[in-house]
């Protein structure tokens, strides 16, 4: 039995973001949504891969640039998807280049959000993912 799981939580989310301020804001935004639980957070590649594998979230919210040089958020997704193919992903980044958007999609991300332009869509997208509707 998973003792970290809140009764009634419909969706478990893991947050991977190198900036503590942004990570805390994302977690605040997630906690405002009913029936969604934050099961972990990380700021670097190893902590992200280990945390996601241990908590097995429904959704990973991943920044591309992480706090170390071991790998990017896209590398994290490529690694954990081998074991968790059903996990959904939202990539959040300041690097909204065609290459990053394509690499995110290739890694299986359902959404790519530009932090400067799309940040406020984050909760709307999580709500839609929770209810099973597609927000594309």
Language-model regions, residue ranges each:
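Acidic, metal-coordinating helix/loop segments flanking the phosphotransfer/catalytic sites
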Residues: 41-59, 67
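Short amphipathic alpha-helix used as the core "switch/output" element in two-component signaling
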Residues: 74-85
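Alpha4 helix (beta4-alpha4-beta5 surface) of REC/receiver domains from two-component response regulators
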Residues: 96-113, 117, 124
């Amino acid at each position: 039995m998973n003792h970290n799981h809140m009764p009634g939580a419909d969706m478990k989310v893991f947050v991977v973001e190198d900036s503590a301020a942004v990570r805390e804001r994302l977690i605040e935004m997630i906690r405002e949504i009913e029936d969604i639980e934050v099961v972990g957070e990380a700021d670097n590649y190893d902590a992200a891969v280990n945390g996601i594998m241990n908590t097995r979230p429904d959704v990973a919210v991943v920044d591309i640039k992480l706090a170390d040089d071991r790998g990017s958020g896209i590398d994290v997704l490529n690694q954990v998807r081998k074991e968790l193919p059903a996990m959904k992903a939202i990539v959040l980044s300041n690097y909204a280049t065609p290459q990053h958007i394509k690499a995110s999609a290739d890694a299986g991300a359902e959404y790519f959000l530009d932090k400067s332009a799309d940040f406020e869509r984050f909760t709307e997208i999580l709500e839609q993912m929770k209810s099973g509707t597609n927000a594309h």
